[in-house]
């Protein structure tokens, strides 16, 4: 007899894996769609030109297309190109591994700054005072401080006349064309949908592929009726707004937010490597090698620090919410419980997952703030090492009240042989019962990255993506439940939508998120293709009257 569930899973997995392999613009259908694309004409950009804030940091540093076009503009003026080249050399020095080569690079930067300008003509971007100080520098500490000053002077220079000239140049006109293109409406027709990856309280997560770029994403589909029935609209909007704000390589990024007839959809980074809970318990003996524990903990710490820098408390830090990408790097996911701190006021609402909640969350009428994430971090490091959480053994049946009392009263014990002294110490500090004694919260400058547990991690290189992960997921494996193991939802009856609901849906469905969308356009090829001056003119079949070919 044929196992239809197994057959359905095989078919879904095969289509999904094939889509992942073909996401590099090699299919004929994708090439045909690409040929139909065309940027809007300059005349359609005038309204945006008047409305768009001309902020240097946003236009030339944060937004990938703006950064690329500003770089191309600088290359047209020798002095501007020289300034850009200096900043690139500074970045290379900052990210270099410690050693003689880094020292030589520092000396070279100071020599560049100390070079005497042409008599009677001041240096275009270094002040006379800086040049004099660089000429007199004798120690590496002095040189490093002077390079930081030089970097600041070059940035100030670029933000002045070069930026004004950029705004009046064809390069900025091109940027506006891309911004108009970015603002086109997005619907479910924009994507090809593949297998379901999982389900949550309000809907399912499935794999999708952008039809015109081949980029794969995860789409979190929130059932509109289920959201309304369970009063989940506010939480869904908060998660969406938080995802829009975050910009970290260690947190899943939001690329699109749109609505279909039945769902509100969040399109986010697709993490093909599975979650850390799977890797802890389902691959070999419970627990992970210490090299992986340190690497993942370092990336998670960077992600949590980024959230805290934005005034956000995560509240759901646990291995199940940490996902691996194709290369083996990890990101925090599921920000559904994350909350924005308002005016520095602590939180009182209880939220989190049993076994990872800090004592101050569990205590009656207690308030809490950022330190709860560091307690959960301690639980997660412990679990990665030992294959169990600090206060409950794996699969141990224990009541919520017993687990609460253990968390409040018991001291953590380290019985697993894999614990190093550094791992024990960082877990003890993260798992301190009171927030004031907890690592990351003892004082304003208390940075967990400085703990000796991370002595092998070069954090600037880690944040730049230059540290090789200790484990790379198998690209031929689907790290997700079989589709027949994912329960279906029952139909929600008796829910009708009014004008307030429709306004909420429109507020949620804002389309493409600029940074993620621009990264996709550059990464998958349309940026180079549509900017190519030798590309044949004309939009082909299906062009719109505005001159923009919609990505349908």
UniProtKB/Swiss-Prot annotation:
User: What residues show lipidation of type S-geranylgeranyl cysteine?
Assistant: 549
Tell me how the protein is altered or processed after translation: Autophosphorylated in vitro at Ser-490. Phosphorylation at Ser-36 is regulated by light and activated by cAMP.
Domain called AGC-kinase C-terminal: residue spans: 455-520
Top-rank lineage group of the source organism: Eukaryota
Q: Which residues carry this modification: Phosphoserine?
A: 36
Propeptide residues according to the Swiss-Prot or TrEMBL record: 550-552
* Main EC class the enzyme belongs to: transferase
Q: Which UniProt keywords apply?
A: ATP-binding, Kinase, Lipoprotein, Membrane, Methylation, Nucleotide-binding, Phosphoprotein, Prenylation, Sensory transduction, Serine/threonine-protein kinase, Transferase, Vision
Q: By what name is this protein known?
A: Rhodopsin kinase GRK7
Q: What is the lineage of its organism?
A: Eukaryota, Metazoa, Chordata, Craniata, Vertebrata
């Amino acid at each position: 007899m044929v196992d239809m569930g197994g057959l359905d899973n095989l078919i879904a997995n095969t289509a999904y894996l094939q889509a992942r392999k073909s996401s590099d613009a090699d299919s004929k259908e994708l090439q045909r769609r690409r040929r139909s694309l065309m940027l809007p004409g300059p005349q359609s950009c005038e309204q945006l030109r008047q409305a768009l804030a001309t902020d240097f940091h946003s236009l030339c540093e944060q937004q990938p297309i703006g950064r690329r076009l500003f770089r191309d503009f600088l290359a047209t003026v020798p002095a501007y190109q020289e300034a850009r080249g200096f900043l690139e050399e500074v970045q290379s020095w900052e990210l270099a591994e410690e050693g003689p080569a880094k020292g030589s690079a520092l000396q070279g930067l100071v020599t560049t700054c100390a070079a005497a300008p042409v008599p009677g003509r001041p240096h275009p971007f270094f002040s006379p005072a800086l040049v004099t100080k660089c000429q007199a520098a004798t120690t590496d500490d002095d040189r490093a401080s002077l390079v930081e000053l030089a970097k600041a002077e070059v940035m100030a220079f670029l933000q002045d006349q070069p930026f004004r000239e950029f705004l009046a140049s064809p390069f900025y006109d091109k940027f506006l064309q891309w911004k108009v293109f970015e603002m086109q409406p997005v619907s479910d027709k924009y994507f090809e949908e593949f297998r379901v990856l999982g389900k949550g309280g309000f809907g399912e997560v499935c794999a999708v592929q952008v039809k015109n770029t081949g980029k794969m994403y995860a789409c979190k589909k929130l059932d509109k009726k289920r959201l309304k029935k369970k009063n989940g609209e506010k939480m869904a909007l908060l998660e969406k707004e938080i995802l829009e704000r975050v910009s970290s390589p260690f947190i899943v990024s939001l690329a699109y937010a749109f609505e279909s007839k039945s769902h509100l959809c969040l399109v986010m980074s697709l993490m093909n490597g599975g979650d850390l809970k799977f890797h802890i318990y389902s691959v070999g003996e419970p627990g992970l090698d210490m090299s992986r524990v340190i690497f993942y903990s370092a990336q998670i710490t960077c992600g949590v620090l980024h959230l805290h820098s934005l005034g956000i408390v995560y509240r759901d830090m646990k291995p199940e919410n940490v996902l691996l990408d194709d290369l083996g790097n990890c990101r925090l996911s599921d920000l559904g419980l994350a909350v924005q701190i308002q005016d520095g006021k602590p939180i009182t609402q209880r939220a989190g997952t049993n076994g990872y909640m800090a004592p101050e969350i569990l205590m009656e009428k207690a308030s809490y703030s950022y330190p709860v994430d560091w307690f959960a971090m301690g639980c997660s490091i412990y679990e990665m090492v030992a294959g169990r959480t600090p206060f409950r053994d794996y699969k141990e049946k224990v009541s919520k009240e017993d687990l609460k009392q253990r968390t409040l009263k018991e001291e953590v014990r380290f019985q697993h042989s894999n614990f190093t002294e550094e791992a024990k110490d960082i877990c003890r500090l993260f798992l301190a019962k009171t927030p004031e004694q907890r690592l990351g919260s003892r004082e304003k400058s208390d940075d967990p990255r400085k703990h000796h547990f991370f002595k092998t991690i070069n954090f600037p290189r880690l944040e730049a993506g230059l540290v090789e992960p200790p484990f790379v997921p198998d690209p031929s494996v689907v790290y997700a439940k079989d589709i027949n193991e994912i329960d279906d939802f029952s139909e929600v009856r008796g829910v009708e939508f009014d004008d307030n609901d429709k306004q909420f849906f429109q507020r949620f469905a804002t389309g493409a998120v600029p940074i993620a969308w621009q990264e996709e356009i550059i990464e998958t090829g349309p940026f180079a293709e549509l900017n190519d001056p030798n590309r044949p003119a004309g939009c082909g079949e299906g062009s719109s009257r505005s001159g923009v070919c919609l990505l349908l």
